[in-house]
Curated annotation (Swiss-Prot):
Gene, per the UniProt record: argH
Name of the protein in its database record: Argininosuccinate lyase
Gene Ontology BP annotations: arginine biosynthetic process via ornithine; L-arginine biosynthetic process
GO terms assigned for molecular function: argininosuccinate lyase activity
Pfam families: ASL_C2, Lyase_1
Length: 468
């Protein structure tokens, strides 16, 4: 027996039967796209105002529609969005409630509009706000990193390559690396916001509309820079969502790297940081454990965010122009990416603000592993006139001999040093301190405490001027 068509459906006139129950379930997006209710109502109010101003509908109908939409916004804000699968999506949910409130004029709201340009408009508005909220989260993380970098501009730690001690750096300098990554992340979201800020509204289904609409007016009312120039492009492309997911994936990679370092630094072999109770968990069987779960979860969320970009790319990669229902799944993907990144940023900011750094252990490890060997090679170039490659060879021989004796370079016996090269004297070796090493790195972007403080001041000045 065929299902009876739903007379309240917005599109059921040409159908003799209603959808199967499973069809209704797979077709409905209201459980997901109800998050667009504020954007949908805002866009509908702008559209109704334009219809009235252009005399496409009467001023009385436009006013009634606006009052009804304002009431719906109040209802949804107070009680949430009702979920009725028969209404499919947020657009039809709003329109159905509007009809209950104002009657026949509600049917005039959709004049010169399709759900294709409606959803594209809502989605761009939502993504625009999402870019701004992620930017605020990145700014908060930058601020926390800058504060901790300022506190530790002089604190010495080992710099690593291949996770082997390489050269001494300051903890402040190390943290500033993540400030720079966050700066570029903010730039990517700003670029994404700028490119998405064009209005699809008025493109209708795909070909535009025969009504004398004012697309510039609705674009301006919604804060867009301009209407989109091609109606097919307006309803069919989701590159703005892809760009958001790409920026989110890169930001998540940066967060994951910092999270990994916190996990490593908190481990007993390193012991560089003490995790606060607020950002740790324990074990159900081992009472001594303090696990860096917050950092591990941030690291894990990066996989979700990388997957979000891939998922959305696979959805859109083979779609012919213009609209296909595959695009219904774009919103769940982007919503999930936003939620994961926003939560990760908040968690990482909290950890950075409250980590206790064990700078004594950091300095001790920084002074091991022949970390000042490059300083000795540089001295031989500057003071003894050796070509760098020869100096590199000489210092390598010194390190090899020190390893054989089980000592660090400053403790290499004078006779052994002199046997390698006469310029390597006890006084020279004694000057190979980690403090002298970091102080000498005065090149722009270097780890010298003076340079670190300059970089912090520059970053704060840029933030104050909105130039991150």
């Amino acid at each position: 027996m065929a299902n009876t068509p739903d007379k309240s459906s917005m599109w059921g006139g040409r159908f003799g039967g209603g959808p199967a129950a499973i069809m209704q379930e797979i077709n409905a997006s209201i459980p997901i796209d109800k998050r667009l209710w504020e954007e949908d109502i805002a866009a509908s109010r702008a559209h109704a105002a334009m219809l009235g101003a252009c005399r496409i509908i009467s001023a009385d109908d436009a006013a009634a529609i606006d009052r009804g939409l304002a009431q719906i916004a109040e209802e949804f804000a107070e009680n949430g969005v009702p979920v009725d699968l028969s209404l499919e999506d947020i657009h039809m949910t709003v329109e159905a409630r509007l009809k209950e409130l104002i009657g026949e004029p509600a049917g005039r709201l959709h004049t010169a509009r399709s759900r294709n340009d409606q959803v594209a408009t809502d989605f761009r508005l939502w993504t625009r706000t999402a870019c701004e909220r992620i930017d605020a989260g990145l700014a908060a993380l930058q601020s926390a990193l800058l504060q901790r970098a300022d506190e530790h501009a002089d604190s010495i730690m080992p710099g690593f390559t291949h996770l082997q001690v390489a050269q001494p750096v300051t903890l402040g300098h190390h943290l500033l690396a993540y400030v720079e990554m966050a700066r570029r992340d903010r730039g990517r979201f700003a670029d994404a916001r700028r490119r998405l800020n064009e209005s699809p509204l008025g493109a209708a289904a795909l070909a535009g509309t025969g009504f004398p609409v004012d697309r510039d007016a609705t674009a301006a009312a919604l804060g867009f820079d301009r209407p989109m120039a091609n109606s097919i492009d307006a309803v069919s492309d989701r590159d703005f969502a892809l760009e958001f997911c790409a920026a989110a994936a890169i930001a998540a990679i940066h967060l994951s790297r910092l999270a990994e370092e916190i996990v490593i630094w908190a481990s007993q072999p390193f012991g560089f940081v003490a995790l606060p109770d607020a950002w740790s968990t324990g074990s159900s069987i081992m009472p001594q454990k303090r696990n860096p779960d917050a950092a591990e979860l941030v690291r894990g969320r990066a996989g979700l965010l990388l997957g979000a970009f891939q998922r959305l790319a696979v959805i859109v990669k083979g779609l012919p122009l213009t609209y296909s229902k595959d695009l219904q799944d774009d919103k769940e993907t982007l919503f999930g990416a936003f939620d994961a990144l926003a939560l990760s940023l908040a968690a990482m900011t909290g950890m950075v603000e409250t980590l206790s750094f064990r700078t004594d252990r950091m300095r001790a490890l920084a002074a091991s592993g022949y970390s000042t060997a490059t300083d000795l090679a540089d001295w031989l170039v500057r003071e003894a006139g050796l070509p760098f490659r020869e100096a590199h060879h000489v210092v390598g021989a010194c390190v090899r001999r020190a390893e054989e004796l089980g000592v660090e370079l400053p403790a290499l016996p004078a006779a052994d040093a002199a046997a390698i090269h006469a310029a390597v004297t006890p006084d020279v070796l004694a000057a190979l301190t980690v403090e002298a090493s970091v102080a000498s790195r005065m090149s722009y972007g270097g780890t010298a405490p003076e340079r670190v403080r300059q970089a912090i001041a520059a970053a704060r000045a840029a933030a104050a001027q909105g130039q991150d």
